Amino acid sequence: MSMAIKYSVIAGSGSYLPERVVSNDELAVELAQRGIQTSDEWIVERTGIRQRHLAERGVTTSVLATEAARRAMADAGVGPADLDLIIVATSTPDFVFPSTACLVQANLGAKGGAAFDVQAVCSGFAYALTTADSFVRAGRVRCALVIGAEVFSSILDWNDRSTCVLFGDGAGAVVIKAADEPGILAAQLHADGSQTKILCAAGNVAYGQVTGDPFLRMDGQAVFKQAVTVLDRSARDVCAEAGMTIDQVDWLVPHQANVRILNFLARKLNVSADRVVVTVDQHANTSAASVPLALDAARRDGRIKPGQHVLMQGVGGGFTWGSVLARM
């Protein structure tokens, strides 16, 4: 592989959502049967979420990831033989091992390239995209498939109103290719392991038994405070790394956690609401899938145009966060 390659560009995107759409009203009815009280008004007021897509039982992360991958590959005009690298960002893999990326590779009929998962929860796509970009810049690969995919409904405690209304399932993907001109301009990844307990799913499988608490648990107020602080700083730092300012960014594509975080972040960055891609109302929080889902939606509806600058940001359990600035 030539070492002269210096840059990577996003050549295509794709996404996939499970067919089942559950509105807040429908979810409220289901939860009422468990003795949990909520309503569309309660959920929208606190989160901005109006509906979510939920996978049927038995539909795994690799299924969603594969379909998103196929759509991204079609958009980029590449086939399985072109893929030198597949990275899947997920916190809900099909198995302990093999990796979800290897399952996707098999589903696509791709052979021989590297395939592995990364796990940084809702920051996962930023971590995966930055990793793939580094492989391309190093001249190790010419074409990489990067996927964020989750079946978060499988790790929710449906008796916990504070979390079960927030999340959905889905997958988004991009294809990046080697290029002579920069597409991905700058990226930064960070973590603070001292904050593990504010957002976690602390269960495990050991000796044939599930140990610990297998469900997602969250301190919502702590997550909000941490998220808006680190995302603000990260956005400014990654723009500075690229020799740009926030004003020069055409689109902000943040992790779709809830509308309150998105609005607060936009105000801190002095970014107008019409420059922020928002899909959380339709998708809910899809963890590692949220950023590529939002990116693909905005590319396909014509909002994001070639040549525009897009700032993608993730933040999640760990505590982790990351930003990627790209010219489309």
Curated annotation (Swiss-Prot):
The keyword 4Fe-4S does not apply. The active site is at residues 122, 255, 285. GO terms for biological process: fatty acid biosynthetic process; secondary metabolite biosynthetic process. GO terms for molecular function: 3-oxoacyl-[acyl-carrier-protein] synthase activity; beta-ketoacyl-acyl-carrier-protein synthase III activity. CDD domains: KAS_III (cd00830). One of its GO terms (cellular component) is cytoplasm. Pathway: Lipid metabolism; fatty acid biosynthesis. Belongs to the thiolase-like superfamily. FabH family. Catalyzes the condensation reaction of fatty acid synthesis by the addition to an acyl acceptor of two carbons from malonyl-ACP. Catalyzes the first condensation reaction which initiates fatty acid synthesis and may therefore play a role in governing the total rate of fatty acid production. Possesses both acetoacetyl-ACP synthase and acetyl transacylase activities. Its substrate specificity determines the biosynthesis of branched-chain and/or straight-chain of fatty acids. This is Beta-ketoacyl-[acyl-carrier-protein] synthase III. It comes from Bordetella avium (strain 197N). The lineage of its organism: Bacteria, Pseudomonadati, Pseudomonadota, Betaproteobacteria, Burkholderiales.
